[in-house]
Structures are given as structure tokens and as C-alpha cells.
Amino acid sequence: MKRTVISSSNAYASKRSRLDIEHDFEQYHSLNKKYYPRPITRTGANQFNNKSRAKPMEIVEKLQKKQKTSFENVSTVMHWFRNDLRLYDNVGLYKSVALFQQLRQKNAKAKLYAVYVINEDDWRAHMDSGWKLMFIMGALKNLQQSLAELHIPLLLWEFHTPKSTLSNSKEFVEFFKEKCMNVSSGTGTIITANIEYQTDELYRDIRLLENEDHRLQLKYYHDSCIVAPGLITTDRGTNYSVFTPWYKKWVLYVNNYKKSTSEICHLHIIEPLKYNETFELKPFQYSLPDEFLQYIPKSKWCLPDVSEEAALSRLKDFLGTKSSKYNNEKDMLYLGGTSGLSVYITTGRISTRLIVNQAFQSCNGQIMSKALKDNSSTQNFIKEVAWRDFYRHCMCNWPYTSMGMPYRLDTLDIKWENNPVAFEKWCTGNTGIPIVDAIMRKLLYTGYINNRSRMITASFLSKNLLIDWRWGERWFMKHLIDGDSSSNVGGWGFCSSTGIDAQPYFRVFNMDIQAKKYDPQMIFVKQWVPELISSENKRPENYPKPLVDLKHSRERALKVYKDAM
Ligand SMILES: Cc1cc2nc3c(=O)[nH]c(=O)nc-3n(C[C@H](O)[C@H](O)[C@H](O)COP(=O)(O)OP(=O)(O)OC[C@H]3O[C@@H](n4cnc5c(N)ncnc54)[C@H](O)[C@@H]3O)c2cc1C
């Protein structure tokens, strides 16, 4: 990702000024009660497991089965963009164009639109970061231009209510229907959209499906995964909760498609439209409120290029130069050894099908080696992209993990220490453990840290500090440019031993070993913790003493976890 080059002292100065702003650490301690006054309980979560409560994804599928498409009195087709802000290989958009072409044969005046809906309350409830929202706003402007070249206007609708309402509410359904009616001048509209797998979003879609009528028909599609949720099950038809066997099936599934084509994944490319609708391209009037931008360093921030082309060229660069070294370099803290594609993937500026198709070209015809341990660098890169699918599948299978609950419900009994002062020090990079502080400061300053960094800091928070992993999970969402609830919950569950296919509880990262292995010359640490630049082996006065003793805190974690599990 292209970012401004900053000197270490700038980084620290900027972090200090940000500290003055960051005051409400309590918001990370629990779900926001304004939006979730009655959070799900362990019993409620178990209802999904014992099938006494239907999973939202199943409800969507059931409702969709009953649907029939009718073009009667329909004049408008509209694609509703969500986390799929791209033209290239977008299933819902592709279907939208196909439906429109069918409709056009019946109604020569039919129109095709695209829409994006802003609900700031959804952003607040989900703790979307300023970095990510700024990226989305830039991407929308760019998308508006690209769509205009296809003669498709992109509308921006804002849903605001005085009482802070999420989009899974009946108020939203009314708002949405009314907006559609206005666009189609009182006739019917067909909406296409790609499914988002978090429960709030699925319940929003369910509500809309339940309120379908002749004025509004909704068509939802699987798009964000390479293999859609529900397609990979064990031979007994149950859901996988362990990655490796799931991944082997995933590979089989993908290879099966490849047998009949030259590509490994099917891409959905829209043909040029024979359609020449003219309209005035008006700049969007919306600007992000300050509350979402307060954590962004004003003087130095630099967003990655938001265009679809930038995502493609980033992929090309990565596959051309770095991917062959991925196995050795992906974890190094001082190198950019990974693709840096996550913000593009999270916001949907690039499809993971396209990524895997392109990466596959350098895999000698095999997406995975016969023995997993022999996977080449590029094969392992594809495997990482598969982890993203895995976590999405899991969120559909265990929906309570999208409602603030751990996958392993027994871990609710862990007696967290939850020291708010220790939490603040972790958040702001002042724990006195250099590697943790360097990573947390980088996160604050840039909105991005690599996977190893996320694992190190998540392990430190949940094990060494014994702070409920959900505090850290929320902090990450609020500060990551690529914040994605299923991967974030999945990653935190893995590191804190509370989630799906997690590390065993007795695996506690040793911070000294992590530092020696992934930043042996302290290049990364000295960049972000400039206090340590000139300190040979002595701890300088202006750098905090370690918040915990690593050995003692490890033993404490083992005991507390063991007592609960
Ligand atoms: C505690 C924790 C929190 C995380 N939170 C997020 C998050 O909010 N959003 C997010 O996109 N990823 C998250 N991850 C996964 C991973 O760290 C990032 O996807 C990755 O660091 C992004 O950088 P990259 O694009 O350069 O990755 P690359 O190594 O180049 O990987 C390419 C893509 O594969 C996917 N991917 C890679 N590793 C993982 C993984 N372990 N799990 C799921 N998908 C993966 C991502 O889409 C990534 O962009 C988290 C991991 C942990 C341990």
C-alpha cells in the first residue's frame, strides 16, 4: 500500500496528539447498549447450535426459494452496492445487467441504476474505522465515474433517524421502499445485492425479503467468497470447525470447476451495454462527520489509491515480485512481505476469485501441494485467501460469533482480569514491551498491521494481560483500514483460544522470541518506539517499565484458562 514515508519521530509525535483525542476507552468494554440493549446470552447462542433457532443464512435461503421474478409493471433494475465496490467480477452487478436486458425487451423505457446506502448508525454499531470509511467514500466517487461510463447513475441514499436505528429495522424497510418508489416513479423495482454474512446485515435482508411486494423484488447473490457458504460440509453433512480438512475440500471444490475451463474460478464480466441513458453526473453532497475521522492523524495520513485499477496493479506487482518470497517474508515486521490487498478485498474493490485466478498462473497447475507442508509461497498465499472464506462460512454456521459471543461458549467462564488501565496502555502502545508498543503505535498511525503483528498483540492482550479478547477485537475494528468482522473475530478467536480452530490455550506467544524472530535487528521497533533508538541495552527513562512480567503473566494465563476450560 502506498503511504507517506514518515520519520520515526513524526510517528511518535502524531501518536501523542492522537492520545489527546482518544478518551472514551469504555466503548470497547462491551457491546454498545444503544444498539444492542439485549445482547445474546449463552442460552440464546446455544439455540443456534441445537437448531431451536434458525440461522439467518438459512432463513434468507428459504425465503429466496419461494421467490419468482416478475417483470410486470417493473420499470427499474437497481444494484445495491455494499462491500462489493467494483465493476469487475461482481456477481450481483452482473445479474443486475442481465435482468435489465431482459426487462428492456419488454419495456423499452426501463432504467438501470446503482445505489449505496449510508447509515451512520450501522457504522457506529459496528465500530467501522475512519480509515476504512474514508477509503469507501473515495471508492464511491471513483465508482460513480466508472458507472457513468456505462450510463448507470450511482445514487447515494442516507438513512438517518432521530433514535439511532440500525438497518435491520422496520423503519429502514419503509425508507428503502419509499426511495425505490421515488426512483421508479411509483412502478416496481428489482434490486440485486451481494450477501453480507454478518447477522445484522442478514436480518436486514430478511426483513426486506419478508416485505417484498409488487413494488419491490430483491435478488441476493453469493459473491464475496470463492466458494459460497453452505457448499463445503463433512461427509456426514455437518459443518467443519477445523481449517485443514475444510481447506482440502475447498481445494477439491475449486479444482472441480477448473476441470472444464482454463481458469480456476468463474469470473462475472459485464458486456458493454447497448444503452445510452444520459444523466447529469452530480458530485455527492455527503461528507464524513468528524466523529469518524478523529483518530486519523491530520498532518501525515495518506490513503492508498482507491481505484479498482490500483487494486489490480497492486496484485500484479505482488505476484510479479513478492509472492515467490511469501513463505519467508510474510511475517517479518520490518518488511512489506504480504500483498497489502486487504483494504481492497474488504471493501470489495477486487474479487478474491480474480486474485486466486491470477495467483494460480504461477502454481504449476496445482492450487495446493500433495503434502500441505510442501506448499509453495504462492500456494500458501492462496491458502491465506481461503482462510477468509473459512471464517465467513463459520460466521454463517455459528451466527452468534457475529453477535459478540465466542465460538467456544465454555470460554465465557474465563475470569478475565480486565484492567482498564492496562487496556489503555495496550491501545496506545505504552505497555513497556517494545514489540507490542511498536505494533500498536503503527496501527494507530497507519490503520494497517500485518498478520504476525495482529497475532502478537492479540496474544499479549488476551493471555499476558488477561483482558477479554472482545475489547481488543473492537479496538482493531475501530482502527483497522481493512476491518472485517468475520476475519477479525476469527483472528481474535484463534489467538485468544476462544474461537474456531483456535490455538491451544497453553500456546502463549513469547514476546522476546517473537521480537528476535520477526524483527531481529530491531528495525521495526526503533521506527515506532524512537525512545529506544539510542538505548543500548538499558531501558531509557522516558520509556515505560513493562506492564507485566512475561513469565509470570504466562503462568497466570495458563491457570486461569485451565480453570475455565
Ligand atoms: C487478531 C487478528 C485480527 C484480524 N483482523 C482482520 C480484519 O479485520 N480484516 C481482515 O481482512 N483480516 C484480518 N485478519 C487477517 C489478516 O491479518 C489480514 O487479512 C492480513 O494481515 C491483511 O494483510 P494482507 O492483505 O497484506 O495479507 P496477505 O497475506 O497478502 O493475504 C491476502 C489476503 O488473504 C486474506 N487473509 C490473509 N490472512 C488471513 C487470515 N489469517 N484470516 C483471514 N483472511 C486472511 C485477506 O483477505 C488478505 O488480504 C486478522 C488476523 C488476526 C490474527
UniProtKB/Swiss-Prot annotation:
Keyword annotations: Chromophore, DNA damage, DNA repair, DNA-binding, FAD, Flavoprotein, Lyase, Mitochondrion, Nucleotide-binding, Nucleus, Transit peptide
Catalytic activity: cyclobutadipyrimidine (in DNA) = 2 pyrimidine residues (in DNA)
E.C. no: 4.1.99.3
Result after altering W387A: Reduces substrate binding 100-fold. Reduces quantum yield for dimer photolysis 3-fold
One Gene Ontology term of the molecular function aspect: mRNA binding
Listed Gene3D superfamilies: 1.25.40.80, DNA Cyclobutane Dipyrimidine Photolyase, subunit A, domain 3, HUPs
Binding site for FAD: Y326, T338, S339, G340, L341, S342, D482, G483, D484
Protein's name according to its UniProt entry: Deoxyribodipyrimidine photo-lyase, mitochondrial
Names of the cofactor(s): FAD; (6R)-5,10-methylene-5,6,7,8-tetrahydrofolate
